[in-house]
């Protein structure tokens, strides 16, 4: 008895690139529609996995390229969340990642589904050499303005990293310069380009969202668990 379509589908769904190549050659003469469809699905899956692996590798390699001639530079990435909400603080995340292991699906937090953000944030915190999230309350922002608030939040987050025993050689900031430190390097749209900035964007988002959910327990009428303090 020949191999059933269901069995072939299962093998193809679990195959890596090397095994797929073997199966594809073995099935070249199999004209069953289910087999042809399964081959096409597996090929698309493997291509998507290869594309994601390349994207992730580029985030880490681009980050390394910003470190000049020091291949062992310690890099901290920073990003903020919570600009312009109706309620809740500004949050700035600071993350120092090791070169390995690389964190699957790491990306700008806005490009990541909420459930995936939770998983990625947990993995970032597990493998990070150091991490911190610093909050600035709305009253401080009202009194001092956003630029001063960002400067305080970013500098406080870096200080917390250093107090944890990790001294960064390079400080990567997403967006415009803040002139915090001579180690500062600014990367426009860095949360989609640099691994540590992406990690900071995800962790700060997850931590702030969790804070707003706790606020919702005290102020249920504002629905903070759903809106996280934003108007829409």
PLM ranges: what are they?
Residues 1-76, 83-232:
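RNase H-like, Mg2+-dependent phosphodiesterase core
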């Amino acid at each position: 008895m020949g191999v059933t379509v269901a069995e072939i589908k299962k093998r193809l769904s679990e195959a890596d690139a090397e095994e797929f190549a073997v199966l594809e050659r073995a099935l070249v003469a199999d004209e069953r529609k289910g087999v042809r469809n399964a081959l096409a699905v597996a090929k698309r899956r493997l291509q998507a996995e290869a594309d994601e692996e390349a994207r992730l590798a580029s985030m880490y390699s681009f980050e390394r390229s910003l470190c000049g001639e020091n291949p062992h530079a310690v890099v901290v990435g920073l990003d903020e969340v919570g600009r312009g909400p109706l309620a809740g603080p500004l949050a700035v995340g600071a993350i120092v990642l090791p070169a390995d292991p690389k964190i699957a699906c790491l990306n700008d937090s806005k490009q990541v589904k909420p459930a995936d953000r939770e998983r990625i944030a947990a993995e970032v915190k597990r493998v990070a050499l150091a991490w911190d999230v610093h909050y600035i309350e709305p009253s401080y922002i009202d009194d001092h303005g956003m630029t001063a608030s960002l400067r305080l939040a970013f500098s406080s987050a870096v200080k917390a990293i250093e107090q944890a025993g990790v001294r960064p050689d390079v400080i990567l900031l997403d967006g415009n310069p803040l002139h915090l430190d001579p180690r500062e390097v600014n990367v426009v749209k860095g949360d989609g380009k640099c691994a540590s900035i992406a990690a900071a964007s995800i962790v700060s988002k997850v931590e702030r969202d969790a804070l707003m959910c706790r606020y919702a327990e005290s102020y249920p009428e504002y629905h903070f668990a759903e809106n996280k303090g934003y108007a829409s």
